[in-house]
Amino acid sequence: MPRRREVPKREILPDPKFGSVELAKFMNVVMLDGKKAVAERIVYGALAQVQTKTGKEPIEVFTLAINNIKPIVEVKSRRVGGANYQVPVEVRPVRRLALAMRWLREAAKKRGEKSMDLRLAGELIDASEGRGAAMKKREDTHKMAEANKAFSHFRW
C-alpha cells in the first residue's frame, strides 16, 4: 500500500451537445491514440443514427443501454489450498459503468456494419432493447457467478 496521500479523481466535464458526464466518459473509452475529435464524431454519429432509426431521444437510449449492460456480480479467482476457485463478488458502481462501456465498445467493434458509428448505433439499440453481444457478455458473467455461488464464502 502506498504511504502517500490518495490522488483525487479527475472530474470529467460533461459533453457539449447533451450535457452528459456518462457520454463524455464513453467518448474517452471509444477514443484511440488521443484522437478525441474522431471519437466524438463516432459517438455523435451513432447517436444521430439512433435518433433516425428509433425516433427516440438518443441520450435516453444510450442511458438505458448502459444500465442494461451494467453487471451486478462477477467472478474473481481466489487461490485456496492449491486450488483456484472462481468466487462471485459484487461489482462496485464505478467498475460497473467502466465494464458496461468497455463491453459496449468491444461488441460494437465486432459487428458487421460498415462504419464504427453504424456499428455503435446498432449495438446501442440492441442493448437498450435487452439483446446484442454486450448483453450476452453480461448474461454470461452473471451465469458464471450463479454457477460458482457455492464458493461465495471465500470472499475477502
Curated annotation (Swiss-Prot):
Keywords: Ribonucleoprotein, Ribosomal protein, RNA-binding, rRNA-binding, tRNA-binding. InterPro entries: Ribosomal_uS7, Ribosomal_uS7_bac/org-type, Ribosomal_uS7_CS, Ribosomal_uS7_dom, Ribosomal_uS7_dom_sf. GO terms for molecular function: rRNA binding; structural constituent of ribosome; tRNA binding. Pfam families: Ribosomal_S7 (PF00177). GO terms for biological process: translation. One of its GO terms (cellular component) is small ribosomal subunit. One of the primary rRNA binding proteins, it binds directly to 16S rRNA where it nucleates assembly of the head domain of the 30S subunit. Is located at the subunit interface close to the decoding center, probably blocks exit of the E-site tRNA. Belongs to the universal ribosomal protein uS7 family. Part of the 30S ribosomal subunit. Contacts proteins S9 and S11. This is Small ribosomal subunit protein uS7. It comes from Bordetella avium (strain 197N). The lineage of its organism: Bacteria, Pseudomonadati, Pseudomonadota, Betaproteobacteria, Burkholderiales. The gene is rpsG.
